[in-house]
């Protein structure tokens, strides 16, 4: 395995935040041990906490590595200028701003955060509107769910992955027809 630069011993978001305060403008990466899943009120350093703090300083999560059966590390790096932003990460930034945790470095990296910054692909729009039941159910879903779910589909169009675009669109239409919201779209309620 290649050498891991800046493998931090941060045990929580506040310890990572302190490191980012000191190093976000000069370092190119860090690694933190995190756990994925539904955060609980315990001493675990959760993935979503690390991502939120990274976003506050203009950083983003990237590669994960499994060090052992019970230890996964997450690489965090500065965002590249003009990189694609997921709707989920935009909403995380909005939450951090409301909580007073966002820094100028984080704000400087943010894309258009207005509603005008999210445009639905015409193929997805047509597929939803072609079935009245799908359209009615879609309209009843929370706006954040709609943006996050659509974003995870249309990113595959932008990345020129037509098979995955079709597969995700079909799954979305099928679940929407049944009135089912699926997948992680609100960080287990944090973003509501």
Question: Language-model segments: which ranges?
Answer:
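Charge-dense, helix-prone N-terminal extensions
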Residues: 1-192
């Amino acid at each position: 395995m290649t050498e891991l630069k800046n493998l931090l011993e941060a045990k929580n978001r506040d310890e990572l935040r302190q490191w980012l305060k000191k190093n976000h403008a000069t370092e190119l990466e860090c690694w933190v041990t995190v756990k994925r899943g539904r955060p609980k009120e315990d001493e675990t350093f959760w993935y979503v906490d690390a991502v939120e703090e990274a976003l506050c300083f203009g950083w983003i999560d990237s590669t994960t590595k499994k060090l052992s059966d019970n230890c996964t590390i997450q690489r965090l790096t500065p965002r590249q200028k003009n990189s694609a932003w997921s709707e989920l990460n935009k909403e995380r930034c909005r939450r951090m701003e409301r909580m007073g945790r966002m820094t100028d470095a984080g704000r400087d990296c943010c894309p258009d955060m207005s509603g005008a910054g999210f445009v639905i692909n015409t193929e997805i729009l047509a597929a939803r509107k072609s079935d009245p039941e799908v359209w009615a159910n879609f309209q009843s879903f929370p706006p954040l769910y709609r943006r996050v779910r659509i974003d995870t589909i249309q990113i595959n169009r932008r990345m020129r992955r037509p098979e995955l675009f079709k597969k995700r669109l079909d799954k979305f239409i099928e679940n929407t027809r049944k009135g089912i919201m699926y997948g992680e779209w609100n960080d287990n309620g944090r973003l509501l």
